[in-house]
Amino acid sequence: MLVPELAGQLVCDESSLRWAAEDFGHAVHRRPRAVLRPGGVADVAAIVEFAGKTGLSVAARGSGHSTYGQAQTNGGIVIDMAKLNLVSDVRADRVTAQAGARWSDVLDATLAAGRTPAVLTDYLGTSVGGTLSVGGAGGTSHQHGFQVDSVEELSVVTGTGRLVTCSLRQNRRLFDATRAGLGQCGIIVSATLRVIPAASRVRRYRLQYRDLTTFLAAQHHLINHGKFDFVQGQIFPAAPGVWQYLLEAALYYMPPGTPVDATRIDGQDYGTIADEIDDISYRDFAHRMAPGEAALRDSGEWSYPHAWLTVVLPSAATASLVGEILARLTAAELGQSGLVLLYPIRTDRLHTLLTRSPDSKLAWLFALLRTASVDNPADVAAMIEANRVVHDRAVACGGVTYPINSVPMSAADWRIHFGPRWRQLQAAKEEFDPHGILTPGYGIGTHSAPHCPKPIG
């Protein structure tokens, strides 16, 4: 079958195929048959329609920040979304961005108009389409939910190659199946996002604690306090068997107003062992990972294997489970530049159909961000195996996976994950991707359609 006429290029050179078989995790390598570098949205629609007729699987790749082959496909077509990066139509309450735009691009455009997305990921190099396909968590999620909860409208290419606009009011089934839908029912090509007024300054508190119990209590108090815009906990190895607990909290403000410095926040003293307070621009705060990224790129560690795990835990089980995991975890098992994230999320702020959360008003995002040695593949395998153990413990205590992980997942695992939403996802897959070609890297298995690829003409 002949390839459709394209404004861009469908390439199959060695360099492109090797590139498409890599991601940030460097643990899974699925080699496609071809890579599409689209000249526009019409190319995405045309190649998906072509793939459906020829039995080829399709995966969209944004910034390549997946860690376990989620945006790869073995013998299919990978769509490089990077050039579909236009950010436009910035208004007082919304902005439209193509799926390949990075969150840094979106922020630049909205800040010029005095606006910002309500939730930003820590690393702004991720793509809009990528995070909206999984959720998009950040330090303001205790107030605003995930990034998908700020989506007003999507443009989506379905598994039949149709370009469809969807929202809560139009084509609702596709809208619900696409937000946090792991690319199973459609490829996001653009999104209209709700934005809020942006502060110009940030008062940042970096508070260190001696133990996990105090650390959790302080974060819980801060989100109940209600005045802190950003709350995030980080845990680092300080010495063998000893962990350093760092709480980063931020108040956003506009001069001439100035927030009051306090380490005894709202009259509560949680026994900090070190306090650091600084005042920076909102832009610099949003880009706070940039110096660390530059250092890791210079050292080469940015290109090391990253075996990451993120789960969301019910509040009642968090202290015991995290304490148990930290008691067994060593600095070597975390890796040289690895760290742990632990911060609260109010589940009543999560409104997207396919976003999974524990049956708990307060939940905790817990992430083990492991970095493996580049010289020893056994390190990666050991970290992935350890991730699976933690994942299973989290699920057993009522937690859920945040679906970006370096964890092998079976179709049965995904049925457990989606729980009461599984049948809805399965029905949506049958409706919007009847050939079963979209985003096979997750191994979800919602569709039984056979794959018998035909030659590309």
Please report, for each region that a protein language model flagged, where it lies by residue.
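Activity-critical C-terminal alpha-helical subdomain
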Residues: A294-R297, A307, V395-G457
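Conserved oxyanion/phosphate-binding beta-strand-loop segments in alpha/beta enzyme cores
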Residues: L2-A20
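Short, conserved charged micro-motifs
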Residues: D43-A46, D105, T214-L216, P255-D266, ...
